[in-house]
């Protein structure tokens, strides 16, 4: 009797399905454990909820103003979630779609590797390396960000471009560019690779030009239009190197060393090593593909925000696709040793995951990554918080601390505590402040003292540090 052996394609589908199941479960558990927050999970929930209720991409900003999501980031792909929200109105919907999308990115990696490396087994190894790549896994767990969907879309776009199928490439590239304003620059980099690496100069030039044009329009026209004529609020992160795209260009000519110092600090070099080591540096053998990673690297390395030079956040979304695609084409340069090279990359990804990845089980292994290892653990405190939040009507204007915000943002107005303004309900967690809450501990504490003494507010719930107030006058 003939023994059945699964094909490499079947195995990569199985690996992707297992990965999606695991990371969808981890994402939902982190949400139930209140490890997500108003920033950024709640922002996305409110934008999707508003769209589903006839107010496209409306949300409440930090100061209590009702604005368009496009005033902060050009990620209109959020609109696609509105019909899904009608069917399943839950933040879990966004988390599951994100895990599914990122996991399916393994398929274009497999197709690309099978074509160029010439070995289905090697292609399977490289696809699994993508799934084990620490930046990929942290991306899937960093709350919900539409830009995470750009990673699989960019991989799909690169596959179609490599095949010379420009129409489906265009569809995937446009979809990716709708995930965030700077993703268009990655698409432009793909155009440069296509023009020089595939000698399709006209088509590649058009792709590069369109990518640059849309990215520039999104940043300099769309965001200011929805931001009351003001430039992006995130320019402050680049104040040391010019404070704007134009200022950065001027700094490059007037004080070039300032850019070098900003982009290659010890923190930045550590970030680059965390991106490079789990791919065994094989991507260096395909330098033209790496052109697509340059804009995103510049955006992250020049920023003063430490989150942008950490693989734990979503800022790697535009980097993963060109780095992994370059690793595949780099491995193809060593086609004669395809299986051993793929094995080395897979081993590097596994070791990188052990040292840097988010899999909770690593904390039980000596030297394994322990950062956020218990983030998916739902505690008694979380159950108390969930019970407290059920007291708040779904149509009420709420002010809440960041750690509770992701569970309360599916409404027209949501205020970030300690801002109160027109709120009729307030929810706060005194014992477990979320990431954003730590920026203003004193105003938060003072506001809670004021609420306890104010006769206009009644404390209707207090247990284990969870407080819920209702306006009575």
Q: PLM features: what roles do these ranges have?
A:
Residues 1-25, 114, 120, 202-206:
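Start-transfer (signal-anchor) and selected internal transmembrane alpha helices
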Residues 3, 186-212:
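Perimembrane helix-loop-helix junctions
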Residues 13-17, 121, 208-212, 334-363:
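Signature aromatic-anchored transmembrane alpha helix within multi-pass, membrane-resident enzymes
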Residues 22, 26, 50-51, 200-283, ...:
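Membrane-lumen/periplasm interface segments of specific transmembrane helices
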Residues 92-117:
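Transmembrane-helix motifs of polytopic, lipid-linked glycan transferases
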Residues 123-132, 173, 177:
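Short helix- or helix-capping micro-motifs
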Residues 149, 155-168, 195-198:
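Membrane-interface transmembrane helices that cradle and orient dolichyl/undecaprenyl
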Residues 291-336:
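Hydrophobic/aromatic-rich transmembrane helices and adjacent perimembrane loops
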């Amino acid at each position: 009797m003939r023994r059945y052996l699964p094909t490499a394609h079947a195995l990569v589908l199985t690996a992707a399905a297992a990965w999606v199941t695991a990371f969808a479960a981890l994402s939902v558990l982190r949400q139930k454990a209140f490890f997500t927050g108003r920033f950024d999970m709640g922002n996305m929930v409110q934008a999707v909820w508003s769209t589903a209720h006839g107010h496209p991409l409306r949300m409440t900003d930090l100061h209590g103003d009702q604005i368009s999501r496009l005033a902060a980031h050009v990620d209109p792909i959020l609109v696609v979630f509105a019909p899904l929200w009608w069917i399943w109105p839950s933040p879990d919907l966004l988390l599951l779609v994100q895990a599914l999308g990122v996991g399916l990115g393994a398929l274009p990696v497999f197709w690309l590797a099978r074509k160029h490396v010439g070995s289905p087994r090697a292609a399977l190894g490289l696809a699994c390396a993508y799934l084990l790549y620490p930046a990929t896994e942290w991306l899937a767990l960093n709350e919900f960000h539409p830009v995470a969907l750009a990673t699989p879309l960019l991989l799909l776009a690169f596959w179609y471009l490599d095949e010379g199928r420009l129409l489906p490439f265009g569809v995937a590239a446009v979809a990716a560019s709708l995930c965030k304003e700077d993703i268009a620059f990655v698409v432009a980099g793909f155009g440069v690779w296509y023009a020089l690496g595939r000698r399709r100069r006209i088509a590649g030039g058009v792709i590069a030009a369109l990518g640059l044009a849309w990215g520039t329009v999104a940043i300099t026209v769309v965001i200011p239009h929805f931001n009351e004529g003001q430039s992006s609020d995130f320019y402050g992160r680049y104040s040391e190197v010019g404070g704007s795209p134009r200022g950065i260009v001027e700094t490059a000519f007037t004080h070039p060393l300032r850019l070098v110092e900003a982009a290659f600090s010890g923190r930045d070099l550590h970030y680059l090593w965390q991106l490079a080591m789990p791919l065994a540096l094989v991507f260096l053998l395909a330098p033209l593909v790496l052109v697509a990673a340059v804009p995103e690297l510049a955006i992250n390395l020049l920023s003063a925000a430490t989150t942008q030079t950490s693989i734990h956040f979503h800022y790697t979304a535009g980097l993963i696709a060109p780095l992994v695609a370059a690793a595949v084409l780099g491995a193809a340069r060593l086609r004669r040793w395809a299986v051993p090279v793929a094995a080395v990359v897979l081993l590097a990804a596994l070791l990188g995951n052990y040292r840097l990845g988010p899999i909770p089980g690593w904390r039980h292994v000596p030297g394994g990554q322990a950062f956020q290892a218990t983030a998916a653990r739902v505690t008694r405190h979380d159950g108390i918080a969930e019970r407290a939040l059920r007291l708040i009507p779904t149509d009420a204007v709420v002010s809440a601390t960041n750690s509770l915000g992701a569970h309360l943002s599916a409404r027209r107005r949501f205020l970030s505590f300690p801002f109160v303004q027109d709120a009729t309900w307030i929810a706060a967690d005194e014992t477990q402040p979320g990431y954003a809450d730590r920026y203003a501990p004193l105003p938060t504490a003072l506001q809670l003292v004021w609420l306890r003494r104010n006769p206009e507010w009644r404390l209707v719930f207090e247990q284990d540090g969870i407080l819920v107030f209702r306006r009575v006058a």
